[in-house]
Structures are given as structure tokens and as C-alpha cells.
């Protein structure tokens, strides 16, 4: 009886916190197996769901635990049901029959799909900046055209948009081998259209694209400013697929409403489904990416070296990958296996060709720029006064110190008048949450970051 009350309370809290689509995907699909010795065993059908439960829902498990059991309940996640999986297997099989995967058409050879095999969900590093985009991509790969159509993912270069597109396609083909899937950059789609138009083979072009189950278009902003005929053809392709309930996933470097040079009717259609953004990885995610990229290279990247590298590049993953390539080249030439900070610094200096460009940001510089922006002195920031403008400036400065430097939590706390590390954690979480809700604050922080760098 208590277990049922406990789980219902968790679902109530989750419904308040998550969007409807995320609630359906993360909460409804989860299942409480048992509560024993203050541990709640929770079944999640996908291991990728654990991050959202840990980051977004763990605290509500604690709250529900005190309400129902008068004890702190710790979650333990499992990804295989201990027994009786028959019903779920039947349900999964039923779900797969809900979608028509063009059985009358010949499946596309993998080499013609445009997909890259190396990009999967398993090797995509999740973090706070991409968790919702990953969630949406996973949802699409589970239920084509039944969840979000189109799915529109946008963000700066090198943040994983192409990886996610390929992961969706590869996941679908793993589960439904006869699905007709096509990944193509928008520029290549345009060139393909123009080639078929020039050769008088438009029927062949239409058959290729309008018979797909899943169309994955990368960098759709490339369509901006193109001739009317080109945009018209994509518009018709989009409509043909959408009308047949076939899935479309698009990526861009900007949101639909900021796509200039596109017909309004296209922009409107891009917003029909779900739009998700990917933001640059935070410090912890950058370290996780570096660990993933370096673990099979045959070199010993020391932990302080990884932290150093994570502190040098904060904009995208490609910079991190480039730095790793430069470092391994130096290591190969020098015939060394242990990668120290000195080796990493040498590679970065050569890469940037200017030591002054390196991101070594002192916390007092962050405090100065934040203080100037909000009209708060560093002394006030380090103090304990709780006036609203001082609290905001203090929390923003702590947030940026966490995001832009590789300093430890205790070190950051010390620089703010000896604050406890939990205060820094709270400030970071608070500002991150506000950024997601308040565009004005997000723009303010972006402006401050530009001044800091």
C-alpha cells in the first residue's frame, strides 16, 4: 500500500516539474519495482533515462520518501526487469506495428542512407546542455512520427547535432531494418535537387525523398536565401512526408524564428512539432567528453590534464577533439605515453598560436565584470547581505566561476568570502534553472561572458 502511495506521489511531483511530453517519456515509462531498506528500485526501459531521473527527479524521490515512509529513500535504477518481461515485450511488439515502415518498398542499402555508423546514442555524452534534445531524439527513435514531428534541434557548431541525427537513424535501423532512412546535409539536398532538375529527372528525385520513413536534414539554415523553386521543392517534400505520418528531423545553428531568408510557411512547419536547443557543455560534461575521447588512444591522460583541457575550451566539442589530436601528435613524435599538463599546454599554444588566447580566467575577473554589470561591489558579493540585486550578482558570479574555470567547489566558495561548497552548488543550479526560463537573464549572462573573455 505504501509503495503505491509513494510512487503516485512521485508521479504527481514529476507531472508538476516536467513538460507533458517529457512526463510521458520519462515518468510514465518508469516503474517502481520495490522499496526495501530505504532503497527504491526503479525500472527504466533505457539507460539514457537515468540522467534525467538523477538531475531532475531525484529530489522529489527524497521528498516523497519523507512524506510516506518518514525516511530518506535512495533510488536505485535497473534497466532489465527482474522477472515477467513478457507483457512489456508484447507491448513493444504491438508498438512497432503502429507505424507503416513501407514494407512494399525495397529497403535502402546502408551505404546509401548517408548515416555514419560510429554515431550512436551509446557513445553520445549527455550533459545539462543537451539532455532535453537527447530525450526528444530518443523519443523519436522509439515512436516515429507519433511523438514529435518534426523534431527541430538547434545550437552552435560542434555541439553534437550531427551525432544525434545519425544516432536516431542508426537506432531506427537497428530495431526496424527495413525502414527507409536518409541522412543528408541541407546543402547536399539542394545540390541533389538542382542536379535532378537539370537532368529532367524530377520524378526520380521525388520518389527518392517522398518514399522515406525518416528524413534527417542537417544544417537546414543552408536553405535560407535559396531560390523560390528550391524552397518550394523542400516545402512539397516536407508536406508529402508529414501527410503520410513519416518522421522529419531537422538541425540548424539557430531557432526557426531566427531563420531569415526562408518562406514563412516553411518556418511555420518547422515549429509544428518540438523545438529543442543544445548549449555548450559545462565543465563536468567537457571532462566526460575528454575521458570518452581519450580512453582508447593508448595514452595515459592524467586527471589534472583533462581538467586543464576542459578549462581551456568551453564553446564546443570540436575544439576539444582538435586539442586531443594535437596532443597525441606531440606524444607520438616525442614517444611518450603519459600526457601531462605541460604536454597539453604545449599543444594548445601551437594550436592557438597565441598564449593570450588561452582561457585562464581568474575568479576576481568574473566578480569584477558581474559586479560592474549589476552595480554590486566585490565586497558586497563576498559578504552575506541578502538584498535581491546582491544575491543575484553573487549567484551569477558563482555560476560563471563554475562554468568558465576549472576551480574546485571549495576554491570558488573561498573566493566568495569563505562560502560553503554547497552554497556554490545551489547558486549554480539556481541560475541554470533561471536561464532556462528567463531569456533576459540568459542574454545578460552571455553579455557578461563576452566581456570576461
Curated annotation (Swiss-Prot):
Annotated region described as Domain II, given as residue ranges: 74-113
Signal peptide: none
Any single biological process term in GO: DNA replication initiation
Description of activity control: CcrZ stimulates DnaA, possibly by phosphorylation of an intermediate molecule, to initiate DNA replication.
NCBIfam families documented for this protein: DnaA
Subunit details: Oligomerizes as a right-handed, spiral filament on DNA at oriC. Interacts (via domains I and III) with CcrZ.
Protein name: Chromosomal replication initiator protein DnaA
Origin species: Streptococcus pneumoniae serotype 2 (strain D39 / NCTC 7466)
Upper taxonomic lineage: Bacteria, Bacillati, Bacillota, Bacilli, Lactobacillales
Amino acid at each position: 500500500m505504501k509503495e503505491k502511495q509513494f510512487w503516485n506521489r512521485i508521479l504527481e511531483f514529476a507531472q508538476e516539474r516536467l513538460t507533458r511530453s517529457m512526463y510521458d517519456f520519462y515518468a510514465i515509462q518508469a516503474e517502481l519495482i520495490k522499496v526495501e531498506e530505504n532503497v527504491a528500485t526503479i525500472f527504466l526501459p533505457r539507460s539514457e533515462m537515468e540522467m534525467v531521473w538523477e538531475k531532475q527527479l531525484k529530489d522529489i524521490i527524497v521528498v516523497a520518501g519523507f512524506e510516506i515512509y518518514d525516511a530518506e529513500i535512495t533510488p536505485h535504477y535497473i534497466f532489465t526487469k527482474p522477472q515477467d518481461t513478457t507483457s512489456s515485450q508484447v507491448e513493444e511488439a504491438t508498438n512497432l506495428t503502429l507505424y507503416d515502415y513501407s514494407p512494399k518498398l525495397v529497403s535502402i542499402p546502408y551505404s546509401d542512407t548517408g548515416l555514419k555508423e560510429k554515431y550512436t546514442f551509446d557513445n553520445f555524452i549527455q550533459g545539462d546542455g543537451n539532455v532535453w534534445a537527447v530525450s526528444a531524439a530518443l523519443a523519436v527513435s522509439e515512436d516515429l512520427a507519433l511523438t514529435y514531428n518534426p523534431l527541430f534541434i538547434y545550437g552552435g557548431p560542434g555541439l553534437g547535432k550531427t551525432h544525434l541525427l545519425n544516432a536516431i537513424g542508426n537506432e531506427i535501423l537497428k530495431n526496424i531494418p527495413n525502414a527507409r532512412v536518409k541522412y543528408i546535409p541541407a546543402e547536399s539536398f539542394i545540390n541533389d535537387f538542382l542536379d535532378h532538375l537539370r537532368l529532367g529527372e524530377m520524378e526520380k528525385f521525388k520518389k527518392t525523398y517522398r518514399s522515406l520513413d525518416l528524413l534527417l536534414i542537417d544544417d537546414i539554415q543552408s536553405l535560407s536565401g535559396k531560390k523560390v523553386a528550391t524552397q518550394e521543392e523542400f516545402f512539397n517534400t516536407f508536406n508529402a512526408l508529414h501527410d503520410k505520418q513519416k518522421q522529419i528531423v531537422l538541425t540548424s545553428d539557430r531557432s526557426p524564428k531566427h531563420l531569415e531568408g526562408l518562406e514563412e510557411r516553411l518556418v511555420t512547419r518547422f515549429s509544428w512539432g518540438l523545438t529543442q536547443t543544445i548549449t555548450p557543455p559545462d565543465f563536468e560534461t567537457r571532462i566526460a567528453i575528454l575521458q570518452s575521447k581519450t580512453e582508447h588512444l593508448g595514452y595515459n591522460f592524467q586527471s589534472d590534464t583533462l581538467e586543464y583541457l576542459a578549462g581551456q575550451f568551453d564553446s564546443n566539442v570540436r575544439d576539444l577533439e582538435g586539442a586531443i589530436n594535437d596532443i597525441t601528435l606531440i606524444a607520438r613524435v616525442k614517444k611518450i605515453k603519459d600526457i601531462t599538463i605541460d604536454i597539453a599546454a604545449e599543444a594548445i599554444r601551437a594550436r592557438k598560436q597565441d598564449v593570450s588566447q588561452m582561457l585562464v580566467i581568474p575568479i576576481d575577473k568574473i566578480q569584477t565584470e558581474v559586479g560592474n554589470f549589476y552595480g554590486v561591489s566585490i565586497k558586497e558579493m563576498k559578504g552575506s547581505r541578502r538584498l535581491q540585486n546582491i544575491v543575484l550578482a553573487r549567484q551569477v558570479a558563482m555560476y560563471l566561476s563554475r562554468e568558465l574555470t576549472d576551480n574546485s567547489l571549495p576554491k570558488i566558495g573561498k573566493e566568495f568570502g569563505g562560502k560553503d561548497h554547497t552554497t556554490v552548488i545551489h547558486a549554480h543550479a539556481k541560475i541554470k534553472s533561471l536561464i532556462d526560463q528567463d531569456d533576459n537573464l540568459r542574454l545578460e549572462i552571455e553579455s557578461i561572458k563576452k566581456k570576461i573573455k
